[in-house]
Amino acid sequence: NPSSQYNLEKILFKYKGLPIQLDSIEARYLYYGIKSTVDLKKSEELRTQFKKEDLKKSLELGEAMLSDNPTDLETISVVMECYYRQQDSSTKLNHYSNQFRKLVDAMLSSGDGKSEKTAFLVNSVSDEYILLAILRKNTYQMKRTSKPSKEGMYDIWDDNGNKTYINVIYDMKF
């Protein structure tokens, strides 16, 4: 609905221009309303250029990818790191940091991760790993089990009895 305050086009416009002004509800509509589709070839090229420390090429690729897929957390994190390493683009770094923070806050506000019923909701496996890193979970020391959920797949991460539940959703209408 174009007149709705939660119209995705309006929210996306605000997110791209002044992400810090997004409220938490808008951020959730944006994160869960836009399905990230990753171009594997472009993503691999971005990783290759980033590993070579070609920051200029990485930024060109990353920003082009974000114009097509603005909620791709993995690409946003690479672009942020490039600007951080350049140390002369604090405005751009702040902009992408605000976008990243709003999307992560949307994931964190989706649940507490303590049960299936209150599992964190994420749009992709890469977002799941980003969330786990933010929660300071060492996935190498944890055991993961998976089981189907109504919306996608539950991943249950067990760290010596301390479990974190994440629901990787395939398609969610928010």
Residue ranges of model-derived segments:
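Canonical tetratricopeptide repeat
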Residues: 78-79, 96
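TPR/TPR-like (Sel1-like) alpha-helical repeat modules
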Residues: 84-108, 136
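N-terminal alpha-helical interaction modules that lie
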Residues: 1-61, 115-174
